[in-house]
């Protein structure tokens, strides 16, 4: 969410609003940050895994996963282009 919010902030402000975040008089960056927190809280409250390691992804698989994701056709619909290095950084953050 944070990665894409830089290029399509209005989408993420709408998500934040839908999650109950107060948007009045606040910067997009503040609202988006609170929206991301709200989504993380919802995920945890639902008992869903929040880390790749919780679903059995080994850390050593992350570079290959990033390379595969960089050429996966769905990535071309992403609002912000991503390199395999950027994808790897995101995967490491959620591992």
Question: Where do the protein language model's features map onto the residues?
Answer:
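Gly/Pro-rich interdomain helix-loop hinge
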Residues: 1-61
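Short, amphipathic C-terminal "tail helix"
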Residues: 58-95
